[in-house]
Curated annotation (Swiss-Prot):
Function: Hydrolyzes diadenosine 5',5'''-P1,P4-tetraphosphate to yield ADP.
NCBIfam families, alphabetized: apaH, PRK00166.1
PANTHER family referenced in this protein's UniProt entry, alphabetically: CYTOCHROME C5 (PTHR40942:SF4), PTHR40942
Tree of life domain: Bacteria
Residues in the signal sequence: none
Family matches, as Pfam families: Metallophos
Name of the protein described by the UniProt record: Bis(5'-nucleosyl)-tetraphosphatase, symmetrical
Native source organism of the sequence: Chromohalobacter salexigens (strain ATCC BAA-138 / DSM 3043 / CIP 106854 / NCIMB 13768 / 1H11)
Length: 272
C-alpha cells in the first residue's frame, strides 16, 4: 500500500486523473492525502469535487481557503469573484450532497505511523501538533453545526492577526481559519501577514516564512497553498513538504509518496 500526498487541485481535473494514472493509483490498496483547495480557478472544479468524494475512505482531505470560499457562497451568500469557477457546483443537481460532504472535512490530518501532519497552509511554530489539532476541531465543530451560515458569514477578515489563548468567539475561530488556510509569512510573535503572496523575496520587514521557525516537535508537515514556492522550502528549520506547484497557473500537479519519498509530477495540460 502506498500513501500519496497531492498538491492543490483547484479544479484541474484532467491533470488529477492523469496523475492518478501515472502513479497507478488503486483505491482498494492505496490512499490519497489532498492538501485542500480542491476547487476554484481551474475549469473542472465540479468534476474534482465529485471525483474526490467518490474515493470515500481512500482519500483524506483538508480544507483550503478556496474550499471555505465555496462553502461561504453556499451557506452565507458570499459573492463570487470574476475569476471564480464555482458556479457549476452551486448549480449542480448534487450540490447539497457535495457541499455537505465538503463541510465535514477537517482542517488537519495527522498520522503518527507516517510521521506526518497535513494542513492546507502549514503549521505555525507556536502550536504543538496536539494544540493545532484541538484548534482545528473548534472550527470543524462550527462548520458541521446548525449555525454554519452564521459562522461562514463572519469568517472573513484579517483581524485579529495574532493568536492568543485568550481569544474567544468568532475572533478566535477566524485566527484559526486564517492560520490553517492563509498563512505564509509570520512574525516571531506569531502575527500573520496577509499581503505578501509571492516568493520568499517578498517577505515584509519583520516577517519570515512559517517553516523557518524552529519547533519543539518535528513532524513532517505536508502543505499546499503557496504556489510561488514551487515545492521548495529554503531555510526551513522543520520538515516542511510543499506540494502546491501551481498546476492551475500552468505549472504542474505533484504527488509525493509519503512512504518512499518519491515525487511524481503531471505537467499542466494548458497554461492559464
Amino acid at each position: 500500500m502506498s500513501t500519496y500526498a497531492i498538491g492543490d487541485l483547484q479544479g484541474c481535473h484532467a491533470e488529477f486523473e492523469a496523475l492518478l494514472e501515472r502513479i497507478a493509483f488503486e483505491p482498494r490498496r492505496d490512499r490519497l492525502w489532498l492538501v485542500g483547495d480542491l476547487v476554484n480557478r481551474g475549469p473542472g472544479s465540479l468534476a474534482c469535487l465529485r471525483a474526490v468524494k467518490a474515493l470515500g475512505d481512500s482519500a483524506r482531505v483538508v480544507l483550503g481557503n478556496h474550499d471555505l470560499h465555496l462553502l461561504a457562497a453556499a451557506w452565507a451568500g458570499a459573492p463570487l469573484k470574476r475569476s471564480d469557477t464555482l458556479a457549476p457546483i452551486l448549480e449542480a443537481d448534487d450540490r447539497d450532497e457535495l457541499l455537505d460532504w465538503l463541510r465535514r472535512q477537517p482542517l488537519l490530518v495527522r498520522d503518527d505511523e507516517l510521521d506526518a501532519v497535513m494542513t492546507h497552509a502549514g503549521l505555525p511554530p507556536h502550536w504543538s501538533v496536539t494544540q493545532a489539532a484541538e484548534h482545528a476541531a473548534e472550527v470543524e465543530r462550527a462548520l458541521r453545526g446548525e449555525a454554519v451560515g452564521d459562522f461562514l458569514a463572519a469568517m472573513y477578515g484579517n483581524s485579529p492577526a495574532r493568536w492568543t489563548d485568550e481569544l474567544e468567539g468568532i475572533d478566535r475561530l477566524r485566527v484559526i481559519v486564517n492560520t490553517f488556510t492563509r498563512m505564509r509569512f509570520i512574525a516571531a510573535d506569531g502575527t500573520l501577514d496577509f499581503a505578501a503572496k509571492e516568493g520568499l523575496d517578498s517577505a515584509p520587514e519583520g516577517f519570515a516564512p512559517w517553516f523557518t521557525y524552529a519547533r519543539d516537535d518535528d513532524p513532517r508537515i505536508v502543505f499546499g497553498h503557496w504556489a510561488a514556492l514551487q515545492g521548495a522550502t529554503p531555510g526551513a528549520r522543520v520538515r516542511a513538504l510543499a506540494l502546491d506547484t501551481g498546476c492551475v497557473w500552468g505549472g504542474a500537479l505533484t504527488a509525493l509518496d509519503l512512504v518512499s519519498g518519491e515525487y511524481h509530477v503531471e505537467p499542466a495540460h494548458a497554461s492559464r
